[in-house]
Amino acid sequence: MAIIEAVGAREILDSRGNPTIEVEVALDDGTTARAGVPSGASTGAFEAVERRDGDKTRYGGKGVEDAVHTVIDTIAPEVLGFDASEQRLLDTTLIDLDGSSNKGKLGANAILGVSLAVARAAADSADLPLFRYVGGPNAHLLPVPMMNILNGGSHADSNVDVQEFMVAPIGAPSFREALRRGAEVYHALKSVLKERGLATGLGDEGGFAPNLPSNRDALDLILVAVEKAGYSAGTDVALALDVASTEFFSDGAYQFEGRPHTPEEMVAYYTQLIADYPMVSIEDPLSEDEWDSWAHLVSETGDRVQIVGDDLFVTNPERLAKGIELKAANSLLVKVNQIGTLTETLDAVTLAQRSGFTAMVSHRSGETEDTTIADLSVAVNAGQIKTGAPARGERINKYNQLLRIEDELGDAAVYAGRTAFPRLQG
C-alpha cells in the first residue's frame, strides 16, 4: 500500500502555446509522478468542461490558474491519505466532490490531472510499467498508428474541410515496421507536395496543410505518396478520415466543399468515397446530435468500414450506450479528457468492446509531453491509436513510448495490423 502524501499542480504550455495543467503526486514511499492534461481544438458539445480563467489579460483568457488552485486547495485535502492503488475509489471521490454532470464545478482538466498522476504514481510504486499496471497480464496488443499526415479543418489554416487524412499501416508485421512505413509515406507526401508547388507547412498535429481543390484531391495525393514510398494502398497502407463534421454543420445542413449538403447527401458522399478508396475508418462523418443520420450511414456502410464516434460519444458511457442501442456507429474514439477520469475512460472502452465496437485511443490537438495514451492503448488492447503525424515532439513521444513497450513485451508483443479492423477480415 502506497499512500498519497502530497498533491501539487502548475500551469504549463501545450503544443499550441496555450496553458494547460500539470499535476504532481507524491506517495509516502518516496514515489513521485506527474501528468499533463491535453486540450482539443474541435470539441464536442457534450465533453466534460475544461476550466479556464477567462482573464483576457493573461493568455487571452485561456489561463488555468483557477484549475491549479482547485487542485491544491480543494482536491488535495480530500485525497491525501488515499491508497494510490484504489483508482476507482479515488475517481469516484473526485466525481462526487465535483457534483456536477459535466465536471464543470472543479473542471475536468483539474480532475483528470489528479486521476492520471495518481495512476502513474501507483504504477511506479508497484514497479510496473503503466500499461501493465492498468491493463494487467493480458495487455500485449500494439496498436495500428492512425497517422494524420494531411491536416485540414480546425487543425490547419487551409481551405480543406476534412480535419484529418490518415494513413494506417495495416500490413506491417510489427509496430516498429508500421511506424517506419507511416514515416516513409509522410516524407514521400512532402516530396509529392513540393513537386506540385503545394505548401508543406504543418498543421496542429504535424501533418501538411496545403490548400487543395477538394477533399478527394487530398486522398489522391496520399495515394501517390503511398506508391512513391514503395507500398501498396489497401494492402500495406490503408486510408482513414476524421471529418469533424460538427464543425461545419449549421441549420440542418453541412457547409461542405462550397455548398450546403443535406445529411442524405453526406451519406451518399461517404458511400461513394468508401467505394473509390481503400478506406478503413471514418470518424465523425456527421454532426454530434444527428443520431438518425449516423444510423443510416452505418446501415449503408458499416459492414465495410469503421464508423467512429468522437463528438458523438465524447468517451461518455451514457452516450455510448445510446449509440450502441441505435446502431449509430461501430467504433469509439477514446479521449481521456472528454470524460475526465481514468476509471470512466476504462468503463467506456469496456462497454464498447463488449458490444462489438472497436476502440481507437486518441490524443488532442493541444498535447503535452505526457505519454499516458500510449500505455493506455496497450493496456486496453485497443488495436488502434491516433496521435498525429510522425513529426513534432508531442506526437513523436507517444510513438516512441510504444516502441519501448514493444521492446519490453518482447515475444509477447502482437501488432494488431489488419485484425484491428474486423470489417476487413474474410
Swiss-Prot record:
<protein>
    <recommendedName>
        <fullName>Enolase</fullName>
        <ecNumber>4.2.1.11</ecNumber>
    </recommendedName>
</protein>
<comment type="pathway">
    <text>Carbohydrate degradation; glycolysis; pyruvate from D-glyceraldehyde 3-phosphate: step 4/5.</text>
</comment>
<keyword id="KW-0963">Cytoplasm</keyword>
<dbReference type="InterPro" id="IPR000941">
    <property type="entry name" value="Enolase"/>
</dbReference>
<dbReference type="Pfam" id="PF00113">
    <property type="entry name" value="Enolase_C"/>
</dbReference>
<feature type="binding site">
    <location>
        <position position="386"/>
    </location>
    <ligand>
        <name>(2R)-2-phosphoglycerate</name>
    </ligand>
</feature>
<feature type="binding site">
    <location>
        <position position="163"/>
    </location>
    <ligand>
        <name>(2R)-2-phosphoglycerate</name>
    </ligand>
</feature>
<comment type="similarity">
    <text>Belongs to the enolase family.</text>
</comment>
<feature type="binding site">
    <location>
        <position position="335"/>
    </location>
    <ligand>
        <name>(2R)-2-phosphoglycerate</name>
    </ligand>
</feature>
<feature type="binding site">
    <location>
        <position position="310"/>
    </location>
    <ligand>
        <name>Mg(2+)</name>
    </ligand>
</feature>
<feature type="active site" description="Proton acceptor">
    <location>
        <position position="335"/>
    </location>
</feature>
<keyword id="KW-0964">Secreted</keyword>
<feature type="binding site">
    <location>
        <position position="364"/>
    </location>
    <ligand>
        <name>(2R)-2-phosphoglycerate</name>
    </ligand>
</feature>
<keyword id="KW-0456">Lyase</keyword>
<dbReference type="InterPro" id="IPR029017">
    <property type="entry name" value="Enolase-like_N"/>
</dbReference>
<dbReference type="GO" id="GO:0004634">
    <property type="term" value="F:phosphopyruvate hydratase activity"/>
</dbReference>
<dbReference type="InterPro" id="IPR020809">
    <property type="entry name" value="Enolase_CS"/>
</dbReference>
<comment type="function">
    <text>Catalyzes the reversible conversion of 2-phosphoglycerate (2-PG) into phosphoenolpyruvate (PEP). It is essential for the degradation of carbohydrates via glycolysis.</text>
</comment>
<dbReference type="GO" id="GO:0000015">
    <property type="term" value="C:phosphopyruvate hydratase complex"/>
</dbReference>
<keyword id="KW-0479">Metal-binding</keyword>
<dbReference type="GO" id="GO:0009986">
    <property type="term" value="C:cell surface"/>
</dbReference>
<feature type="binding site">
    <location>
        <position position="365"/>
    </location>
    <ligand>
        <name>(2R)-2-phosphoglycerate</name>
    </ligand>
</feature>
<dbReference type="GO" id="GO:0005576">
    <property type="term" value="C:extracellular region"/>
</dbReference>
<dbReference type="GO" id="GO:0000287">
    <property type="term" value="F:magnesium ion binding"/>
</dbReference>
<keyword id="KW-0460">Magnesium</keyword>
<keyword id="KW-0324">Glycolysis</keyword>
<feature type="binding site">
    <location>
        <position position="242"/>
    </location>
    <ligand>
        <name>Mg(2+)</name>
    </ligand>
</feature>
<feature type="active site" description="Proton donor">
    <location>
        <position position="205"/>
    </location>
</feature>
<dbReference type="InterPro" id="IPR020810">
    <property type="entry name" value="Enolase_C"/>
</dbReference>
<dbReference type="InterPro" id="IPR020811">
    <property type="entry name" value="Enolase_N"/>
</dbReference>
<feature type="binding site">
    <location>
        <position position="283"/>
    </location>
    <ligand>
        <name>Mg(2+)</name>
    </ligand>
</feature>
<dbReference type="InterPro" id="IPR036849">
    <property type="entry name" value="Enolase-like_C_sf"/>
</dbReference>
<dbReference type="Pfam" id="PF03952">
    <property type="entry name" value="Enolase_N"/>
</dbReference>
<dbReference type="GO" id="GO:0006096">
    <property type="term" value="P:glycolytic process"/>
</dbReference>
